[in-house]
């Protein structure tokens, strides 16, 4: 079998003093952080579409990265060699990442199964697992007006067949999750759009997908990935709050959770921390696409995460909900257009993995010391008993509350201590 990364050493942990660019400075998979090994906390995954299909092409220029793999099988072989050498335990893929469209739908399905069986062999040889699979319902021209929300039921049926087969392949490969991202599920103009009907159709599609997943014995999480725009002007999975409302409106909240991406949060006008915290607060945080955007740009740049201070807050949320499993941290990120060498793929992932590993260590210490949770607990302490407890228990009404307010008089102002808390977090960031 051809090897593609023979010139790259296996990536090992060497510690923060190492100057080796092909070594982890903070990610030590076997190190214990609390009750779990670091690898179990982080559950890193490589995104096949960026890492093995990306060429650096953009709207202004053709691809710059020339990769040595050509056939679908070669792409799979290169991927698993990369996973193993990097030390990533998981991967994610779209059906079209490994298996191109055929002349007919039947041929497309046959090609997908053939390549997935090849991937299964590589999984068994390497021990690398599938974090999640998904269907590409946005690239082909048939999906220019959506898949589940397309005005043509023939397109809806085609999308259903594609998802049906990809659910089967994800199940065959032992995938722990399945993701739905509606890149074309939305509109460019309301002049030709029936909003209610399209969202009804999307809900019906998701119910059918969940039914079929259970029918074939798939017990993994079903996840929806929010994104407000790009490629569509307005997407129905705009942000975490929108998706939660959609799930609850259509009776899907007990069947789906969310896969939250950092860059998508920024495009929706939110911080990564906000979107993760909101999903977790509703018990719907299932997995994370780990990347970052550029605050000066208005599109999905999908850069590798390098900002430890941003990630610390996210890791606190994950620790507070006792982990992401069966979800994980998938690097939905790509090297820059001018980063054309194979070794750049390793540098990018090493940086992302070290960023999350260091953030995990810092977040764990903050949680252990209780410096934030203790303040929050005290800040809301008035709701632990008395009138506050009755409010939370819905055991009071406006008449009683008015009497209480008249008796108590003007409430005393209490500082939110934002600056102090920011200094505390900085102390943990700086003291290593």
Label the model's feature ranges.
Residues 283, 302-422, 426-432:
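Flexible, acidic glycine-rich loops studded with aromatic residues
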Residues 59-69, 93-106:
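Glycine-/proline-rich flexible loop or hinge segments
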Residues 49-51, 96-98, 135-138, 183-185, ...:
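Active-site beta-loop-alpha junctions enriched in small/polar residues
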Residues 1-65, 424:
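N-terminal basic, low-complexity leaders that serve as flexible interaction/assembly modules and, when applicable
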Residues 37-44, 68-97:
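Catalytic domains of carbohydrate-active enzymes, especially glycoside hydrolases
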Residues 55-74, 193-199, 233-244, 266-353:
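Gly/Pro-rich active-site loop or hairpin
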Residues 30-33, 74, 78-81, 90, ...:
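Active-site acidic/histidine proton-transfer and metal-coordination neighborhood
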């Amino acid at each position: 079998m051809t090897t593609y990364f023979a010139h790259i050493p296996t990536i090992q942990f060497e510690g923060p003093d190492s100057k080796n660019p092909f070594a982890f400075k903070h990610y030590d998979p076997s190190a214990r952080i609390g009750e779990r090994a670091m690898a179990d906390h982080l559950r890193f995954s490589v995104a096949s579409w960026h890492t093995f299909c990306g060429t650096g092409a953009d709207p202004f220029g053709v691809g710059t990265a020339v990769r040595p793999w050509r056939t679908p099988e070669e792409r799979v072989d290169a991927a698993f060699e990369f996973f193993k050498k990097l030390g990533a335990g998981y991967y994610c893929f779209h059906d079209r990442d490994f298996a191109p469209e055929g002349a007919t739908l039947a041929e497309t399905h046959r090609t997908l199964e053939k390549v997935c069986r090849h991937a299964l062999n590589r999984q068994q040889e390497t021990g690398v697992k599938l974090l999640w699979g998904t269907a590409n319902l946005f690239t082909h021209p048939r999906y220019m007006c959506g898949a589940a929300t397309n005005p043509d039921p023939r397109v809806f049926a085609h999308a259903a067949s594609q998802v049906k087969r990809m659910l089967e392949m994800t199940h065959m490969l032992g995938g722990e999750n399945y993701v739905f991202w509606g890149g074309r599920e939305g509109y460019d103009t309301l002049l030709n759009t029936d909003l209610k009907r399209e969202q009804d159709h999307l809900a019906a599609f998701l119910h059918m997908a969940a039914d079929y997943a259970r029918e074939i014995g798939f017990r993994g999480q079903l996840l929806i990935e929010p994104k407000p725009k790009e490629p569509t002007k307005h997407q129905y999975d705009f942000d975490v709050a929108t998706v939660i409302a959609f799930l609850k409106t259509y009776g899907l909240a007990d069947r789906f959770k969310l896969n939250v991406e950092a860059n998508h949060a920024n495009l929706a006008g939110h911080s990564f921390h906000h979107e993760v915290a909101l999903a977790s607060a509703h018990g719907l945080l299932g997995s994370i696409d780990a990347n970052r955007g550029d605050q000066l740009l208005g599109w999905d740049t999908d850069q590798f995460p390098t900002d430890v201070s941003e990630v610390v807050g996210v890791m606190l949320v994950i620790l507070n909900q006792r982990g992401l499993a069966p979800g994980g941290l998938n690097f939905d990120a790509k090297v820059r257009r001018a980063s054309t060498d194979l070794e750049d793929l390793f540098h990018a992932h090493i940086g992302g993995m070290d960023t999350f590993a260091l953030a995990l260590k810092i977040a764990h210490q903050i949680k252990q010391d209780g410096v934030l949770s203790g303040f929050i607990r005290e800040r809301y302490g008035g709701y632990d008993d008395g009138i506050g407890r009755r409010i939370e228990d819905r055991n009071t009404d406006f008449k009683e509350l008015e009497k209480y307010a008249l008796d108590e008089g003007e409430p005393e102002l209490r500082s939110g201590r934002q600056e102090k808390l920011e200094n505390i977090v900085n102390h943990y960031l700086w003291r290593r």
